[in-house]
Design a protein with these regions (language model features):
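Conserved, well-structured ligand/cofactor-binding cores
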Residues: 1-458
Length: 458
């Protein structure tokens, strides 16, 4: 491998000749061999850095035109566009497990953008610190990258996934509105319910989750950029905070604004905790929905067997013909991961000391993993399972009329205690509720038929 020599304030470093990063990135790459090539800084953060560095260059060009010349601006914006598009992903090698402020990742962005801008300009125009990092600090850029990436993850990935599954459940509701089945509480038989009503519970849960996500994402539109090192805005020109936030809003199409209090924006991660709570709530509902689906599909002969789900792949290496509810299992595992990530995000957010939180990379890593995994899991569950759910009408009818909890319909006619005696006798003697009720002398066969209509119990 060929190398070139780069330098920073600590001296010279050998850097691979074909890489755009420079000395500070190389130092971090060598000093933090933790999760290398596996737990790298999320690409969402890298792309967010491209957005905020472009926004900063545009703001600086307006406020400091003597320093951010049009020639520099053009080259920097072009380089940033390549970062945003992912073309330069291979030039961002750093791991999550680095400095807690994300300083090295900020410098990784500064170095790559500067070197790429210089390549595009055909001249050594741009300096990583003096130009790309102008009016900024790692302490306000990393929190800004966190918020940009979090907003994009929720609004552009997770919410569309949730809405997709909501649409599928709406269709299933309409298709199954004529089916009455046995309800269940405590994993025990309960009074009847329409299958469409059961599905409506799934759908309404996700609609509420979407509402919570939209509410929780709003505070993340506030950006720390302009607070610089400790929130005072040192070395940032007047008006920079407002202008750079407006530029980020233009570039993303999202209503980003400058944070009202930069001291809070640098040291507190409460908005991230709040938003991840909404992600966790969605994961909790997906856990419930997926579990319901696999319970209802259990069998095919010895389980509930009330619905059919798509058979996507063989389920066992030893039991021929076995097919498992794999999509349900995948989404429930993702839900568990999200719940674990919520603990990590909360713990990281609690570590803001004085003017800065220095657990930001781990908070961002877990937050973005949660949003990404859950969005992809929901889409997979929808496309490979939910869209193919069909009712086993015969089994639902059999289970409904075999349920002892239908005896609840007799309460108004024979009373609670006599209804309980009827259910117990039917179970003990393995006879129908009608046979038990008549043999106990509570109702005649004719009267039983008059008052006993499970379809009217919903």
């Amino acid at each position: 491998m060929e190398y070139r020599i780069e330098h920073d304030s600590m001296g010279e470093m050998r850097v691979p000749a074909d890489r755009l990063w420079a000395a500070q990135t190389q130092r971090s790459h060598e000093n933090f061999r933790i999760g290398v090539d596996i737990e790298t800084m999320p690409r969402e953060i890298t792309h967010a850095f491209g957005i905020l560095k472009k926004a900063a260059a545009l703001a600086n060009a307006a406020l400091k035109p003597e320093k951010m010349t049009q020639e520099k601006l053009k080259a920097i914006c072009s380089a940033c566009d390549e970062v945003i598009s992912g073309e330069l992903n291979s030039h961002f090698p750093l791991v999550v497990w680095q400095t807690g402020s994300g300083t090295q990742s900020n410098m990784n962005a500064n170095e790559v953008i500067a070197n790429r801008a210089n390549q595009l300009a055909g001249a050594r125009l741009c300096h990583p610190n003096d130009d790309i990092n102008m009016s900024q600090s790692s302490n306000d850029t990393f929190p800004t990258a966190m918020h940009i990436s979090a907003v994009l993850a929720i609004e552009d990935k997770l919410l569309p996934a949730v809405e997709l599954l909501i649409g599928t459940f709406k269709r299933l509701e309409a298709e199954n509105d004529d089916i009455v089945k046995s309800g269940r509480t405590h994993l025990q038989d309960a009074t009847p319910i329409k299958f469409s009503q059961e599905i409506s519970g799934w759908r309404a849960s996700l609609e509420r989750d979407a509402e919570l996500l939209r509410m929780a994402v709003k505070p993340l539109h506030e950006l720390a950029l302009g607070g610089t090192a400790v929130g005072t805005g040192l070395n940032a020109p007047k008006g920079f905070s407002e202008l750079v936030a407006a530029k980020v809003a233009e570039l993303t199409g999202k209503p980003f604004v400058t944070a009202e209090n930069k001291f809070h924006a640098l040291t507190s991660k409460d908005e991230l905790v709040f938003a991840h709570g909404a992600i966790k709530a969605t994961a909790c509902d997906m856990m419930k929905i997926a579990n319901d689906v696999r319970w209802l599909a259990s069998g095919p002969r010895d389980g509930l067997g009330e619905i059919h789900i798509p058979e996507n792949e063989p389920g066992s290496s030893i039991m021929p013909g076995k097919v498992n509810p794999t999509q349900c299992e995948a989404v429930t595992m993702v839900a568990v991961q999200v719940m674990g990530n919520d603990v990590a995000v909360g713990m990281a957010a609690s570590q803001g000391n004085f003017e800065l939180n220095v657990f930001m990379p781990v908070a961002a890593y877990n937050f973005l993993q949660s949003a990404r995994l859950l969005a992809e899991a929901i889409v997979s569950f929808n496309n490979n399972c939910a869209v193919g759910i069909t009712a086993n009408r015969e089994k639902m009818h059999h289970n409904l009329y075999n349920s002892l909890m239908l005896v609840t319909a007799l309460n108004p006619y024979i009373g609670y205690e006599n209804a309980a005696k009827t259910a117990k006798k039917a179970f003990k003697d393995n006879i129908s509720l009608k046979e038990a009720c008549v043999s106990l002398g509570f109702l005649t066969a004719e009267r039983f038929d008059e008052v006993f209509h499970p379809e009217n119990m919903i």
